[in-house]
Amino acid sequence: MGAMLNLLLVVTVILCSILSPTRFMIMIDKMVADGYDPLDPFGKIIIKWDLLLSSPGQHHVQVTLENMQEYRHVEKPGWKLSWHWLNQEVIWDMKGAETTEQGNCSAFASSGNLPHCCLERPTIVDLLPGASLNVQVANCCRGGVLTSMSQDHANHVSAFHMTVGSSPDGPEEFNMPSNFDIGVPGYSCDNATSVSPTKFSTDKGRRKTQALATWEAVCVYSQFRSSPSPKCCVSLSAFYYQNIVPCPTCSCGCSSSHCVKDGELPPYLEQKHDPDEEVSPVVKCSDHMCPIRIHWHVKVNYREYWRVKITATNFNTMKNYTNWNLVVLHPNLKSVQQVFSFNYKSLTPYQNSINDTGMFWGVQFYNDVLLQEGKIGNVQTELLLKKDMGNFTFREGWAFPRRILFNGDECVMPSPDDFPRLPKSAHSSSSSSAVISSVSVVFCFLLHHLLLLV
């Protein structure tokens, strides 16, 4: 992996030298827009189709959605999987999920039973919790919610079964559909490709069966596709700096008549709530106009440690953020000693060669829900870090994070020029202390030798 990183660095230098700065930045922006995340380089959602049984005109399929992302999850209202049938196939039966519409099934009126769905492009949704046992399958019925691998590995997979039939005039063999979409803003999917058949364990692992055929489609996330504007911002402060560095002005937009002013009641009753659609944020009026603000405060300086307080505040009057998470990039996170009131996991996507990224999330039933804007619409933690004497300093804004993400979306940071700085007296006092210390050592050395001569 070290060799790969070195090769990547060399390629970057070469590209910088042969391309103009503008063209190079356009290329980097395209990589980001296409869904590459350097903090989670292997993150993706995989749609897997397993053909379990097949007979002329009828095919039994298991479809699985697996969230392979470390910290980005699919929250309510959940995924809505759709695709395009190539030969007007129909879905006769489903378990673990259902289509949102049946469509026109008049071609099968004489068959006695109508198919579950006859649409050329069906939209499938997960069943809700509490669905009848006779329609459940393993890993179903969570309302389309997919947790991230780091935060809740047990619930990062959804699955359903269906029986696919041919149209009256269509071919009898099974054909994979195309043009997949999971119905979550920011995600784009490629077409399915054939992979090695999935193997299933039975009889407590003593026997393995396998699918007749397996295909996979990959979906990746891009924040640029998800939203035209950012969703969070960062403010900074420190014990040695008298002012708070606020979020940059208009980080997520500029003030308008759509925000909620102090003393006003949020327009809950005026909002049209579709349970199958995410509610648009209505934020409290502020200079930054972001639904979420993250505040990083350098709180205490000890001899061998230092302490930071992190606060996430919800300015969105329309939404509680369930199972929220934060991802922070800072070089001293490799020396985290203790995290109070949050869960914490170090993220090392490059095989432990770099350990400067950490993920924070709430404790279940305590602070795993960030409530809507109000007096209790915040969560906070403190973390204790051991000083790395090789590079630790409070100078030049080193104590502040390089990047912060909330629920997988990049937050707008203040400019490094605006970071809290040590007062000039601290620089001069440290220099004076060094001089005084040196003079004291020399004085003690001379005094010792004078006493020996006496």
From Swiss-Prot:
Residues 430-454 form a propeptide. The lineage of its organism: Eukaryota, Viridiplantae, Streptophyta, Embryophyta, Tracheophyta. InterPro entries: COB_C, COBRA_pln. A lipid is attached at residue 429 (GPI-anchor amidated serine). GO terms for cellular component: plasma membrane; side of membrane. Belongs to the COBRA family. Keywords: Cell membrane, Glycoprotein, GPI-anchor, Lipoprotein, Membrane, Signal. GO terms for biological process: cellulose microfibril organization. It is found in: Cell membrane. PANTHER family: COBRA-LIKE PROTEIN 6 (PTHR31673:SF30), PROTEIN COBRA (PTHR31673). Expressed in flowers and siliques. Pfam families: COB_C, COBRA. Residues 1-24 form the signal peptide. This is COBRA-like protein 6. It is a lipid-anchor; GPI-anchor. Glycans are attached at residues 104, 191, 320, 355, 391. Its main location: membrane. It comes from the Eukaryota.
